[in-house]
Amino acid sequence: MVGMTSAQHFDLVIIGTGSGNSIPSPEFDDKSIAIIEKGTFGGTCLNVGCIPTKMYVYAADVALAAREATRLGLSAHVDAVDWDGIVERVFHNRIDQIARGGEEYRRGEETPNITVFDQHARFIGPKTLQAGDDIITGDNIVIATGSSPVLPEPYASSSVPVHTNEDIMRLEKQPRSLIVVGGGYIAMEFAHVFDGLGTEVTVVNRSEKFLRFLDEDLSSRFNDIARERFDVRIGTATALEETADGVRLTLDSGDVVEAEAILVATGRQPNGDQMDLSTSGIEMHEDGRIKVDEFGRTTCEGVWALGDVSSPYMLKHVANAEQRAVQHNLLHPEDLRPMPHEHIPAAIFTHPQIATVGLTEAQAREEGYDVTVKVQNFGDVAYGWAMEDSTGICKLVADRATGKLLGAHIMGPQASTLIQQLITAMVYDLDIREFARSQYWIHPALPEVVENAVLGLEWQE
């Protein structure tokens, strides 16, 4: 290979600097480590995903609270949105500094055993990588390259500027109007962000229902709220054109939608398809995920994978948990620890917030459980009165015979916080029949909605 350097060998090679970057703890100080990152240090979550989006969500929440203040007897309004100020606060003052600091640390004197390569990595043989002009081999290789937005047609081949979550937050100016394509959590969060900040939002989805994976009670209520809040169009795009003022989208339903900008949030795909994995004997699932066993091992001995590139759960807290398992397994090959894939929660930072863990009611019935179900309204507890909440619910699904909590589903203020105590109940297999009365619940605080939901479950005599 002309121009190639001789192979450099390392004890450990890590591809990707999201969760994978947390593997080199002090226990690895005696190991030679290569970190390969073609993009920005920190991965999706830090740079273009969960963290900056929630910083935008919080600003939108505050703006929306002012809009809805009349129900509390207040007259409030947002005079203006300083888009440049938000971008500077989120990225220049926070995210970019953290990403830059992370790279400087890995390249610096504090980690002399680590070498950083800033090129795209691909396999050219078993446990052998090419990154730019460098050939890199390793005793162990960890693939933690994450995922990327999916752009279906006609967006993928269009010359019209199409935005994804990876650039929408860094727009030079806030659009007066925005088309959001998609019906999943990314689409719904950004629809909330831009509508909350005053952009006119049109949501385009190919099916009638948003967030279809949710329990039916939450899904139906959220869809009612979304349809009241956003201009919703159902259909699949047949044409995308650039106009003098922005974009024009034509749907197979005949609808034509125009806006200053368009965001496509129709899903994500694992970043394993451009790494020539087959040259190393690494197999993939049909959906593009790298095949791993319960310990994170791929089909090539000594090669591991974690996070979005291999996991069925595209969630940062899952990637972090998988990273801890792989980290342990690298250090203790005689005592392998499985990936922790039980009781995985998820939250959606829309308005209202949504959080869920475990089985939906339909799933529990399909699995043959004799279920007991309670749907508790936020508006029926004291703090719900204080907020004048009329949409929030806490739904619990339990096994009537054993008191085992099978699923918890919350939609309303602070849902992502309220769900945590129910995750604990499931992880430690607590008898939910004793859960409400074996502890104090602060009155009149919002967790009383969970207490009342538990007390409302009906049990076998």
Locations of the language-model features?
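Hydrophobic Val/Ile/Leu positions in short beta-strands of Rossmann-like dinucleotide-binding domains
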Residues: 14, 35, 179-181, 187, ...
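Glycine-rich flavin
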Residues: 2-10, 17-18, 23-31, 36-174, ...
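Flexible, glycine-rich terminal cap/loop adjacent to redox cofactors
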Residues: 10-39, 44, 51, 55-65, ...
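Short hydrophobic core segments
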Residues: 13-15, 121-122, 136-146, 180-181, ...
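FAD-site-proximal beta/loop scaffold in flavoenzymes
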Residues: 159-175, 256-333
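A Rossmann-like FAD-binding core segment of flavoenzymes
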Residues: 115-118, 122-130, 197-294, 359, ...
